[in-house]
Design a protein with these regions (language model features):
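Active-site rim segments in enzyme catalytic domains, especially the processed small/beta chain
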Residues: 90-150
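Positively charged, low-complexity intrinsically disordered regions
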Residues: 5-8, 127, 174
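Carbohydrate-active enzyme catalytic cores, enriched for enzymes
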Residues: 1-104, 109, 156-160
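Extended, loop-rich substrate-binding clefts of extracytoplasmic carbohydrate-active enzymes
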Residues: 54-71, 137, 141-185
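Low-complexity, polar-biased intrinsically disordered regions enriched in Pro/Ser/Thr/Gly
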Residues: 80-84, 116, 184
Length: 185
């Protein structure tokens, strides 16, 4: 199985959360649900999951999709209650997948507390596929607090259109507002 294919989690979620619609999305990996009592006979028939563009505004993720190609735009706020808990400086970053190939990816982070400098590099604005202004972070890092960001920026989705002949997402954030005038990209 491709390491990027996480449909087996939908198979588990289908059983644990009784979400019939996840059964179709999990194919062919629904078999993971066997560990929690699902059987082929007990599984309801589900229609195929929608494959068009979709918005998850509560989580701040917007996906523009055409067939198997997609662009994911990250519009989620910096953390919980204004504290950037376990957050990266990735506002308005994009992930792009075309013709079976990852073009732009989120770098993630493979380490945490063993190397604080490396961890901060991986969660920096420059590590993500988004705009960096004057080499500044979208949200300032807080020294000594690896899992926190200063809540400097707010993100706002201005327009979301999908399902028609034109699909559009217009969003902005104010992470550079605290910087001096005449920024250099």
């Amino acid at each position: 199985r491709d390491v990027r294919d996480h449909r087996h989690l939908l198979g588990l979620g289908r059983v644990l959360f009784d979400r019939v619609e996840w059964r179709a999305a999990a194919r062919p990996s629904w078999i993971e649900g066997l560990w929690f009592g699902a059987t082929p006979e007990s599984e309801p028939t589900a229609t195929a999951a929608p494959t068009g563009s979709i918005a998850f505004p509560a989580g701040g993720f917007y996906i523009l999709r055409h067939e198997q190609d997609y662009l994911l735009l990250n519009c989620n706020p910096p953390g919980t209650n204004g504290v950037g808990t376990h957050k990266h400086n990735d506002l308005l970053s994009v992930e792009l997948y075309i013709d079976g190939e990852d073009i732009l990816v989120d770098p993630g982070c493979f380490l945490y507390t063993s190397d604080p400098q490396a961890y901060n590099r991986f969660r920096s604005t420059r590590a993500h596929s988004t705009v960096t202004v004057d080499q500044a972070e979208q949200n300032r890092l807080i020294p000594g607090k690896l899992f926190c960001l200063h809540p400097d920026s707010r993100v706002q989705v201005l327009q979301w259109e999908s399902g028609g002949p034109v699909e559009r997402l217009v969003a902005e954030h104010d992470g550079a507002a605290r910087l001096e005038l005449a920024p250099v990209l």
